Amino acid sequence: MCVSRRRNSGRPILRVRAPHLLRARPHRRSKLKHRRISRKRATLAGSAVVALVAAGFTFQTANASDDVPAFGAKTLSADAAGKLATTLDRDLGADAAGSYYDATAKTLVVNVVDEAGAEQVRQAGGKARIVENSLAELKSARGTLTEKATIPGTSWAVDPVSNKVLVTADSTVDGAAWKKLSAVVEGLGGKAELNRTAGEFTPLIAGGDAIWGSGSRCSLGFNVVKGGEPYFLTAGHCTESVTSWSDTQGGSEIGANEGSSFPENDYGLVKYTSDTAHPSEVNLYDGSTQAITQAGDATVGQAVTRSGSTTQVHDGEVTALDATVNYGNGDIVNGLIQTTVCAEPGDSGGALFAGDTALGLTSGGSGDCSSGGTTFFQPVPEALAAYGAEIG
């Protein structure tokens, strides 16, 4: 992938920056498959001794086996691994149990529930890993959490490394809410794990230096093209509250909202209404830029970079996909990318990318860039599909 480091010229341009909103929290709007035999049953049938381990509320023991050799595992880039993961997830069907990129070995690790699936993975060039919980079972566990534990300040996502649903509670979850959440997670047994995070889950909304609207500030995510016309993507909780934008406080309009989706999703589309230059680049805050040529899906284990006007450029890793986060006030967002990239108020709506590939728009999270934290991103491909747009 190519990195463009073009020095800034004297011509005013509007690059990809991380949106932030300085105002109150936004208003709410709105092939046959082998039949597998459970490993648990096989263990009970083949042994007279069953070890029962009580782990309290946090289930630390993974139900996965790493003893399957990586026959023929291909050396892959993160991008190639992501494409292989998509193909295998489709081909494995009910035998699929998630996957992640091993950045050290440069291989795609694919979870499966039986040897037939493992052989299919090896033939495709992945490293097979037989685990206890299928992806369908983990999705069912997520459904239980949605039904019984929809509590502000919580999030959950399937973690393919531990083969569990990782449930996280922020500092606001205590008392009866904590007891309720703990009981639900405990009831899910080896399918879930409960953890705490410092701080509070919130959309990362605050002042920035990119675009202004109605006394509030945000900054764009990625420049895109729709029907041959220029637009940009930003966070939905920005476009939910502001209808038009300028590139200076009190300045002339440069764009007007064309669409907004928040909560449930967190993306918005703004159409340029001026002749402001709009290159498909991300500001690297060192006088250079990163060219963006395509959009893609993130992969667990992938190294990623975030650009934001508050904390500028920071790196991290994708830890989960299809995450759900409850920001409170009924603002629940689904299908997010969960990462270890730090972020702070003012970075909201900013660009998450890997090389020249656009991955996400900063939604929210907890912690900061001094102590670290968890940050969630709206996938870019979903937003592009919703609006019929493309990177450009």
Swiss-Prot record:
GO molecular function: serine-type endopeptidase activity
Membrane-spanning parts: none
Positions annotated as active site in the UniProt record: 237, 266, 348
Keywords per UniProt: Disulfide bond, Hydrolase, Protease, Serine protease, Signal, Zymogen
EC number of the protein: 3.4.21.-
Propeptide regions on this chain: 65-204
UniProt record, GO biological process: proteolysis
Xref: Pfam families: Pro_Al_protease, Trypsin
Keyword Ligase belongs to the record: no
Keyword NADP assigned: no
Disulfide bonds: 218-238, 342-369
Secretion signal, residue range per the UniProt entry: 1-64
GO annotations of cellular component type: extracellular region
Sequence similarity: Belongs to the peptidase S1 family.
Subunit: Homodimer.
Function: Has a primary specificity for large aliphatic or aromatic amino acids.
Record's protein name: Streptogrisin-D
